[in-house]
Each structure stands twice: as structure tokens, then as C-alpha cells.
Regions:
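Extended, folded cores of ATP/NTP-driven motor/assembly subunits in large transport
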Residues: 1-334
């Protein structure tokens, strides 16, 4: 829910909270050498750590099923009878084969959004634009496009997510003619919450799951494999940095509590005649991660972020939904 969406792309979520969204282009990460991969990861790290504790960060990846008929019209070469049709037919045949093999059936849209509180829309736009320009400059160093979304673009992307193909391209002229708000062009025609675990949204089902117990550093393997699983999913990673002193205090307190828990478990086992220096593998791993995180933050100045990692799974029916969830669990466990 939000209160307003301006043509310049600024969204007023509440009277004093605003957000901007940017479209992130592809980064040729898989095919570059180790040195270039290191530079890419360092750029990401520097950009994320530049955010203060008043700015919310959100990465959204929408793996959208492509309408094959529309896709064919947009990519296949028309024949012109000019002597080059043999080459066009060969290229068209290659693309048709890729479609049949399922290699081009999904398109991933990557969005980065920033949000923060401010006194009014003008100040919020200026503040958020400064953050966006800094990120744009950083991404340009690794040849990645980073484009501010206008209000119309944000509406159309949100409509793609929530309405699928059941919407026409939106323009602000439509508001003038219809007397409606941008929400009318985004919201599904029907929503049903009668099921415990999923939502009926027009002719689709949507279930939201969240990822927990992931490591201190979340690698790209999970996201990459999820994107390659031929599932229509919407991945959303929310993060907000904490002030360094507050984060260090929180980490040390958590480590102390875990060490106390470890001692308690050792004493409990000793009373039953068993003594082990190491106890629960998960607990030992969490203590080691806390140690490593404190060391890293002290040496590098990296920040600690509170994160929420959720996945929206779309399906045509309950059987397909169950199948998709099983695949996600397999990918998460690998």
C-alpha cells in the first residue's frame, strides 16, 4: 500500500516515508576471470556499505514467464525477399529451437529500491536521488546499467508482478481520462484469502515463503540456481544497516548468549556421564560466524544489516504450486 506515486518515480508510502526504484542491468559475472569477479563483488560491497542506518534497501528479482507469441513477434526477423532471407530463416530457426528447449521462456527483471523518511516529497526526491547517483556511478565501473524508474515504469513493473498479462501499458494520461489512481492499474481484479497457505490472485495462485538460517555471507549460487529452475518467482531481499556501535554490541551480546548456551549443554551432558568439547554443530557454527563477523567488521569497517529474505511463488494450480515449492526446497538444500 502507498499514498501516491509521482511521475518522476517518487513513491509516497506514508506521509513522511518515500521510495525510489531503479532497474539494474545484467552484469557479465559468470564469464569473467577471478580478478574481475573480485572487482564486481568489491563494488557491490562498497555500494551496500555506503548506506546509512536511516536508509532501507530492497533488491527485487522477478523471474517472469515470457508470452511466447509476443516474444516471437518481438525477436523473430521478418522476411524481406532481398537476398538475405536465408540468413534470417536460419537465425529464426535457432531462436525457435531455443524456445522449444525452454531456454528463453523466462525473463529476469532486477530492481533496486531505496526508502527513507523525510519532511516532504521535494527533500525526499533530492536525498534518494543522491543515493541513486552514487550507485549508478559505482555500477558504471563494472559496465552495469542502473536506470531510475519513472512513475509510469514503476506502475507497469508492479502490474506485471501482480496482474501478469492482464493489464494494458499504463500512462499518466490514463489517470486524467479515467479519474482513477495508479493503484487501480496495479491491483489484481480479484483477491481471495480463503486458503491457509496461498492467495488466489485473478487466475493465478501466489504463496509467500521466507528464507531463514542462511549463512553470514549469502552467495549467488542459490539465486542463480533459482533463476534457472523455470519457476515464476519474485525474490525480495530487504536490508537496513545498523550503526556500527549498536551492531557490535548486538553481536557481542549474541555471541555471549550462545557461549552460555554451549556451556549449559556441556554441563547437562557431563551430568549424564558424557563430556564433549564441541556440542551442537549448528551452535558451534553460529559462534564461529559471530567471531568472524566481529573480526571482519573491526578490520574492514563493513556494516551489519538486518535482513528479510522472502520469495513469492506463482502457479496456475495447487499441483504446480507444490511442485515449485519442492524445487525451491531442493535448491535451498543443495
Amino acid at each position: 500500500l502507498y499514498q501516491g506515486l509521482f511521475p518522476n518515480g517518487l513513491m509516497q508510502v506514508t506521509p513522511d516515508y518515500f521510495s525510489q526504484s531503479y532497474l539494474l542491468g545484467d552484469v557479465n559475472y559468470q564469464t569473467v576471470g577471478l580478478e574481475d569477479k573480485g572487482a564486481i563483488m568489491e563494488t557491490y560491497s562498497d555500494l551496500i556499505n555506503s548506506l546509512d542506518d536511516k536508509t532501507n534497501f530492497q533488491l527485487t528479482i522477478f523471474n517472469q514467464r515470457v508470452n511466447l507469441d509476443k516474444f516471437r513477434k518481438s525477436v523473430l526477423y521478418p522476411l524481406h525477399e532481398d537476398g538475405y532471407d536465408t540468413y534470417r530463416e536460419e537465425l529464426n530457426r535457432i531462436m525457435e529451437n531455443n524456445l522449444e528447449a525452454g531456454e528463453n521462456n523466462f525473463s529476469a527483471v532486477k530492481l533496486i529500491s531505496f526508502g527513507k523518511s523525510d519532511q516532504n516529497p521535494k527533500l525526499a526526491y533530492r536525498s534518494l536521488s543522491q543515493i541513486g547517483e552514487y550507485f549508478k556511478s559505482g555500477f558504471s565501473e563494472i559496465d552495469a546499467n542502473f536506470t531510475l524508474l519513472s512513475g509510469e515504469s514503476r506502475v507497469n513493473h508492479l502490474a506485471d508482478m501482480l496482474r501478469g498479462e492482464n493489464h494494458l501499458p499504463f500512462t499518466y494520461q490514463d489517470l486524467v481520462r479515467s479519474g482513477q489512481t495508479t493503484k487501480h492499474f496495479i491491483a489484481p481484479t480479484s483477491l481471495s484469502f480463503k486458503h491457509k497457505n496461498h492467495i488466489e490472485m485473478d487466475d493465478r495462485l501466489l504463496q509467500i515463503v521466507y528464507v531463514r538460517d542462511y549463512g553470514m555471507e549469502l552467495g549467488d549460487k542459490f539465486l542463480r540456481e533459482l533463476m534457472q529452475s523455470d519457476l515464476e518467482v519474485m525474490i525480495s531481499l530487504h536490508a537496513k544497516g545498523a550503526a556500527k556501535s549498536e551492531a557490535m554490541t548486538k553481536l557481542r551480546t549474541k555471541k555471549t548468549l550462545m557461549e552460555s548456551q554451549k556451556i549449559g549443554e556441556q554441563q547437562k551432558m557431563a551430568r549424564s556421564g558424557v563430556y564433549l568439547e564441541k556440542v551442537s554443530q549448528v551452535l558451534e557454527s553460529n559462534i564461529d560466524e559471530a567471531d568472524e563477523l566481529i573480526k571482519t567488521m573491526t578490520q574492514t569497517g563493513d556494516k551489519l544489516f538486518d535482513t528479510l529474505f522472502v520469495i513469492g511463488v506463482f502457479a496456475e494450480d495447487e499441483d504446480q504450486l507444490k511442485h515449485s515449492l519442492d524445487i525451491i526446497k531442493q535448491v535451498a538444500g543443495s
